[in-house]
Amino acid sequence: MDNHRDGVWIIDAGAQTTYANERMAELLGTSLSEMIGQPSFAYLFPADVEAAQHLFDVKKGGAPNPFRFRLRKKDGSALFVDVQGTPLHDTAGVFMGIVGTFSLSKPLNER
């Protein structure tokens, strides 16, 4: 995953960052050491937190649909991404988190 051309970001059941590849940190304009252990919602604009929480809850249930989202880079600018999130479960079926792949997207008004 470290050499993946897209950003890869793994969050646990509490939405804390447990893994990210270099590309994900690069997309967000930050470092891996700054990302690991941080709440994933720290990379959102306040107006997007409620929608992100809803998507997180939907992904817990295994919804496979990709979605487009806006993230907040370290410098405060917007990053528009297409996200494919996959829920992670242990052998007993308990939800453990989500692995997401993130690719650059254009804002809807630029399409």
List each model region and its residues.
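PAS/PAS-like sensory domain cap-loop motif
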Residues: M24-M35
